[in-house]
């Protein structure tokens, strides 16, 4: 989902509409916000343009299984890699643990917490 070349936020560039904002939310199979950010099985990466979801990609991350695997810190490193690869600018979640909050702060990534219900609605609320 990485965009080629420089992005013109919310504007057409080379006949492509680039997002105003890229957000990530943990999502259940029925489209609700999964209350577990760091242990989510699936997340959605959403491109928001002019207050509307222009693209929605759900990705199996299996963080529930991977959370306790590997050396200390490897799970946070995995999440950082995912967020950077997908150029995420805001994390939308119900709750995030203290360690993950610190990690997001070091990345200067804001977290919109307390999200419940429809994952798409939560993304739009966070983007507004």
Q: Language-model segments: which ranges?
A:
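Non-catalytic interface/targeting segments
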Residues: 2-78, 85, 105, 111-128
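Short alpha-helix boundary/capping motifs
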Residues: 73, 93-94
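Conserved functional loop/turn residues at catalytic and ligand-binding sites
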Residues: 87, 95, 108
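Structural motif
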Residues: 94-95, 114
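Short, glycine/polar-rich helix-capping loops at beta-to-alpha or helix-loop-helix junctions
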Residues: 96-101
